[in-house]
């Protein structure tokens, strides 16, 4: 069940749904607008000949932070990682879904490629997979509205929420745009 504005406010007031910093003006009829943080991860195209999800490639991306008051310019065809300004904390019976903003989509900005789902139990900043599919560069301003977070109530609490030792929660507690840890999916125990 998708939570309404009144349910979202009630969950935040009760301390069950964490959104820091919280601004009530960002609450929409069935979502909460989230804003863009000031850090980005750009791909180092000259360090590797290809991307291998099975290998740890620490130098695949570099952290970039525009100077105060300056935007980040995303050029046509480029893909970078960003993150939400807000720290999101979900209890074991609420899940999240991050969607892009329609106004930005109409400019050619994609907010996420595939990872729009947030498991119950997650706590951290949401990493954004930002792509420019337009023919012109797009300026990304830290603090701008970048997406909308929808919250869904589960039919029962998750038995093993994200962050529990059984799940293997690679991104729990992440701060800023966090690079892929897909290589951990290939690690086998002997």
Curated annotation (Swiss-Prot):
Name this polypeptide is given: dCTP deaminase, dUMP-forming
Domain of life of the source: Bacteria
Role description: Bifunctional enzyme that catalyzes both the deamination of dCTP to dUTP and the hydrolysis of dUTP to dUMP without releasing the toxic dUTP intermediate.
NCBIfam families tied to this protein: dCTP_deam
One GO process term, biological-process aspect: nucleobase-containing small molecule interconversion
Pathway membership, UniProt: Pyrimidine metabolism; dUMP biosynthesis; dUMP from dCTP: step 1/1
Compositional bias per record (Polar residues), positions renumbered to this chain: 171-190
Assembly: Homotrimer.
Catalytic residues (UniProt): 129
Name of the coding gene: dcd
Species per Swiss-Prot/TrEMBL record: Mycobacterium avium (strain 104)
InterPro entries, per the entry: dCTP_deaminase, dUTPase-like_sf, dUTPase_trimeric
Keyword flag Nucleotide-binding: yes
Reactions this protein catalyses: dCTP + 2 H2O = dUMP + NH4(+) + diphosphate
Site (Important for bifunctional activity): 116-117
Family: Belongs to the dCTP deaminase family.
Database matches in Pfam families: DCD (PF22769)
Family annotation (Gene3D superfamilies): 2.70.40.10
């Amino acid at each position: 069940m998708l939570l309404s504005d009144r349910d979202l406010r009630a969950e935040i007031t009760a301390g069950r749904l964490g959104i820091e910093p919280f601004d009530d003006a960002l609450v929409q009829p069935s979502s909460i607008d989230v804003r863009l943080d000031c850090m980005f991860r750009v791909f180092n195209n000259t360090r590797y000949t290809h991307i291998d999800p099975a290998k740890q490639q620490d130098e695949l991306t570099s952290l970039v932070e525009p100077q105060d008051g300056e935007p980040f310019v995303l050029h046509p065809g480029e893909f970078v990682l960003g993150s939400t300004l807000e720290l999101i904390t979900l209890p074991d019976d609420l899940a999240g879904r991050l969607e892009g903003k329609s106004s930005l989509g109409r400019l050619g900005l994609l907010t996420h490629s595939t990872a729009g789902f947030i498991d119950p139990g997650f706590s951290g900043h949401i990493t954004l997979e930002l792509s420019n599919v337009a023919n012109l560069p797009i300026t990304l301003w830290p603090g701008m509205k970048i997406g909308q977070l929808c919250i869904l109530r589960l039919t029962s609490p998750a038995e093993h929420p994200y962050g529990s030792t059984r799940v293997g929660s690679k991104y729990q507690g992440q701060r800023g745009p966090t690079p892929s840890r897909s290589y951990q999916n290939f690690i086998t125990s002997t």
